[in-house]
Structure formats: structure tokens, C-alpha cells
Amino acid sequence: MIKQRTLKRIVQATGVGLHTGKKVTLTLRPAPANTGVIYRRTDLNPPVDFPADAKSVRDTMLCTCLVNEHDVRISTVEHLNAALAGLGIDNIVIEVNAPEIPIMDGSAAPFVYLLLDAGIDELNCAKKFVRIKETVRVEDGDKWAEFRPYNGFTLDFTIDFNHPAIDSSSQRYAMNFSADAFMRQISRARTFGFMRDIEYLQSRGLCLGGSFDCAIVVDDYRVLNEDGLRFEDEFVRHKMLDAIGDLFMCGHNIIGAFTAYKSGHALNNKLLQAVLAKQEAWEFVTFQDDAELPLAFKAPSTVLA
């Protein structure tokens, strides 16, 4: 059978919090079968757990948060969540001694390296996928996102940014998902923001960790980072990275075709909640062997080495 995945060992890293600008220690721990993805704040006494759940997601101007019933939150979970989706990690406990996951370089790549460093272990329990059975679409003005039935996982994302640094040929990105494709084509794409927004937020004591080290920064005319872009279409690739993380907030890889136009964290989450709320639109599935498993989810050699 296709088995659930966790880590082989505990790994730790440090980074800077996007909101506070302070050092954050991140610890990733293996977890037993059927634990799911759990974020944990150890700066609180007692520590507070936040299971990944579409209904717990809140989108703020700066990041995605998980919020519990007491309005306690953990922030900046989206890029790590994308790395978990990319590598198909089903069970993990993610600890931080702060209210937020460190921003690292603004992409998912540092988290991918950390997960690969921990090693990936298979548990003797069937991995559950969410399979889309009916088309579900959500809209917000001219923005929209939808899932259609498809035996695999494809993503097709279009942005519409009128900016000199983003030419029209760099506004759409489509891919057949796999762990290899995620690592090579998506994981290194960084988040982006306007210099004026960062300066304004910092003047109000917010976004204190925001810098050229953790984002693509633009003014009205150009990219300000000395090293420029990692991909010509890094902006839309990062929006796809965000979507992969947002859609994994249900804790399961999804079998279906995702298409979006000008979507963001909030609309991605609205789509995920709309799918899960419509019982006839999806089902849980497991697979007995590799032959049945959609190509998108076959483990690459680098992961289960």
C-alpha cells in the first residue's frame, strides 16, 4: 500500500520572524500515523497546538495564520506548509518558540532542505488523499479559483500585475505536480512586496523582519534586489507555491486539477472550504500499490533514499 510519511529524526533551524524581526528557533519532529500536521507554539505556557485545518486559517496583509478557538494564533505558516505538501509529509509536529514560523529567504526551499535533512520515513498505515469528484469554483469580483476532477494534480495559475518588472509572458504558470517538479520549479520562488509598503509597515512597528534577504522587493519601476530574480516568472511561481501550501491546509494531498486567476491566500482557502463542505464533491482514497497511484504522487528518489 501507499504509506503515510513522517520524518526519520528531529531537526532544528533558526531564522527571523517576519513580524517581530526577532530570532526564532524552529524544530520539526516525527509524529505517529494519523497525527496530521500540527503547528505548536512553545513560547506559551502550556504550549498551544494548532492542527492544520482549513477552517482555522486567517489571511492577514502579511501572511497566513492559524487561529484557535481562544483567538491565539501562529503566523507565517504558508511556505513551510507548501514544503510539506511538496514532499507529501502527512504527520509532523512543528514547534516554534515564537508567535510565527521564521520567514527564512521568503521561499519554501530552506524548509525543503530541512525536511530532506531529517529524512523521510514511511509509516505502516495507508496514506489518505482527497480526490475531487465534482468541479467546485469560487469567485471574488474578477478573481476566481476552481478544482476539477483529474487523476493527478495539476496547477494553472494566472496573475495580472501591471508592473514594468513583470512582462505579460511571465503572468501565467502551469505545471504537472510532483515532488521533483515542486522542488525544482516552485520551492525557490520568493514572496514579494513593494518597498513603500514595507517602509510604511515598519514605521508602524510591523514587518520588522522584512528585508531584501527574505523577499523580492520592488518599487514602481524595477526589482530592487541586487541579485535580481531567480526565475523570469518568479512572481507567478510564488503565487503557485502559496496555493500549494494553502490547499494542503486540509492535511492531505489533493487529486484534481486546480486553476486560478488572480487568486490569493483568502480565495484559495475559500475554495478548499467550499470543496470540503460539499460532501458529494470529494472523497478520501487510498492506494494499494504504485501502479494505481497517480504519477503526481510517486516518491522521487531523493525523498525516500
From Swiss-Prot:
Residues given in the record as Zn(2+) binding sites: 79, 238, 242
EC number, as in UniProt: 3.5.1.108
InterPro entries, per the entry: Ribosomal_Su5_D2-typ_SF (IPR020568), UDP-acyl_GlcNac_deAcase (IPR004463), UDP-acyl_GlcNac_deAcase_C (IPR011334), UDP-acyl_N-AcGlcN_deAcase_N (IPR015870)
Catalytic activity: a UDP-3-O-[(3R)-3-hydroxyacyl]-N-acetyl-alpha-D-glucosamine + H2O = a UDP-3-O-[(3R)-3-hydroxyacyl]-alpha-D-glucosamine + acetate
Pathway participation: Glycolipid biosynthesis; lipid IV(A) biosynthesis; lipid IV(A) from (3R)-3-hydroxytetradecanoyl-[acyl-carrier-protein] and UDP-N-acetyl-alpha-D-glucosamine: step 2/6
Cofactor: Zn(2+)
UniProt keyword annotation of Zinc-finger present: no
Biological-process GO terms, alphabetical: lipid A biosynthetic process
Residue stretches in coiled coil: none
Active site residues according to the UniProt entry: 265
Keyword terms: Hydrolase, Lipid A biosynthesis, Lipid biosynthesis, Lipid metabolism, Metal-binding, Zinc
One cellular-component annotation, GO: membrane
Top-rank lineage group of the source organism: Bacteria
Molecular function per GO: metal ion binding; UDP-3-O-acyl-N-acetylglucosamine deacetylase activity
Keyword set includes Metal-binding: yes
NCBIfam families hit by this protein: lpxC
Family membership: Belongs to the LpxC family.
General function of this protein: Catalyzes the hydrolysis of UDP-3-O-myristoyl-N-acetylglucosamine to form UDP-3-O-myristoylglucosamine and acetate, the committed step in lipid A biosynthesis.
The protein, known as: UDP-3-O-acyl-N-acetylglucosamine deacetylase
